[in-house]
């Protein structure tokens, strides 16, 4: 089971799959590299894969590049969405990510 969060043009969509659904619906594109190659030309935006069972919430953070959608996992580990076009990770101070969990 995993969560897929895609942000495109300021709108974020979340998709949550259990093991049975993902194996039937995503057969053939399960590898992250293959799936990224499929998503990139369509959404031209952000992609993140999270393990199941982790608490997470998304928020927008401003960077010198543009606004990036990031994810806080378990309110203890800061993990940002990878930008498929710009090939960089958005970041924020750990204290800032901690305050968002309070």
UniProtKB/Swiss-Prot annotation:
Bilayer topology: Multi-pass membrane protein
Subcellular location: Membrane
UniProt entry tagged with the keyword Membrane: yes
SS bond list: none
Keyword annotations of the record: Membrane, Transmembrane, Transmembrane helix
Cellular component, GO annotation: membrane
Disruption phenotype: Displays increased levels of spontaneous RAD52 foci in proliferating diploid cells.
Transmembrane regions listed in the UniProt entry: 21-43, 58-80
Any further remark recorded for this protein: Partially overlaps ALT2. Disruption phenotypes caused by deletion of this gene may also be a result of a defect in its overlapping gene.
Name assigned to this protein: Putative uncharacterized membrane protein IRC2
Upper lineage: Eukaryota, Fungi, Dikarya, Ascomycota, Saccharomycotina
């Amino acid at each position: 089971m995993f969560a897929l969060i895609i942000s495109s043009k300021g709108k974020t969509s979340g998709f949550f799959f259990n093991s049975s659904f993902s194996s039937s619906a995503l057969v053939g594109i399960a590898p992250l590299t293959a799936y990224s190659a499929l998503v990139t030309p369509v959404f031209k935006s952000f992609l993140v894969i999270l393990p199941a069972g982790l608490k997470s919430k998304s928020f927008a953070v401003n960077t010198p590049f543009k606004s990036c959608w990031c994810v806080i996992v378990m309110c203890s580990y800061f993990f940002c969405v990878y930008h498929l076009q710009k090939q960089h990770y958005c970041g924020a101070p750990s204290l800032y990510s901690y305050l968002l969990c309070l």
